[in-house]
Amino acid sequence: RSRDETWRVILEKTAVWSDLKGIRAHAELRFKCPKKSALAQGIEASSGDILLFTDADCQPPVAWVSSMVAHFAPGVGFVAGYARPDPVTGFVAKLLAVDNIAVGALGAGSIAMGSPFSCTGRNLGYRREVYDSVGGFSRIGHLIGGDDVYFMRLVAAVGGWQMVFNRALAVLSAPPATKMGDIVQQKIRHAAKGGHYRGGALYLAIGVYSFHFFIAWALLQMIWTGEWEIAVMALWSMRWVVDLMLLWRMAMKTERRLLRYLLAVEVVYIPYVLIFTVLGRLGWFRWKS
């Protein structure tokens, strides 16, 4: 569906690499989300038992395929992995990189606990049998985005398969968006996914929102009255320390220097959670141009 020279490049590559197959997406969308429509078409054209996914702006390491496949032990139907932006330059990009580490930690931890909340399509794999058994994207086709997270949640809800997180390596992705408008739209899209959660994931989302609402209310009260509440500051500081410990363990060694920006991210997270979650639930965002 690209309007540039992508298809010409693909044809050139397929001419010299017989294992590479290019597929042109249909103009008519099968699902509301363009990416789900394209992925479904690609999956149908495939013949393998294991499906691996990354994005066009990503660079998987040489051992990526073997590493992902090695995690598909008997009974494992879904393998999620970590992806990080590279290079990361500029203050905003570094804040977004810290946020990316946090999202990765959420995915790794929740999958290990058996209640998956997050994953990324930049580094993902599942069995063809899993895809077929849940009806592909048909149950989530009406939702914009979520070819990764919504599908993972669907597989978890249906049950019958184990999910694991591959920490062995990371896929490098393109640097984050630099235009503030694009960043805002992306974050609203991401926040919108929480509104479609059910069960324990929904209760967690409500808890996170309530916590940030309390922190925001308490901070505004302290600013208004000029009186600092030790209990509130202690709670917020404790949250920062716990997050630092968690993200330090999740981050690749080359990323850990970015955690010096964690405090700034914690501050930005307050309006992000309170405002963007509502805007996302209302559908006030656009898909990638």
Task: Indicate where each model-derived feature is located.
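A conserved acidic beta->alpha catalytic loop
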Residues: R1-I10, A27, C58
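Membrane-embedded multi-pass helical conduit in multi-pass membrane proteins
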Residues: L202-L204, V208-W284
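Conserved nucleotide-sugar donor-binding
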Residues: S47-D49, T120-V134
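Short aromatic/hydrophobic "clamp" motif used to bind/position activated sugar donors
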Residues: L39, L51
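Acidic helix N-cap motif at the loop->helix transition within catalytic regions
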Residues: D4-K13, G22, A63
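A short, amphipathic alpha-helix embedded in the catalytic core of nucleotide-handling enzymes
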Residues: I10, P61-F72, V79-Y82
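A short, glycine-/small-residue-rich helix N-cap motif at loop->alpha-helix starts
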Residues: E28-S37, I43, I144-G145
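Catalytic donor/gating beta->alpha subdomain of glycosyltransferases that bind UDP-sugars
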Residues: F72, V76-G104, E129-D132, F137-A201
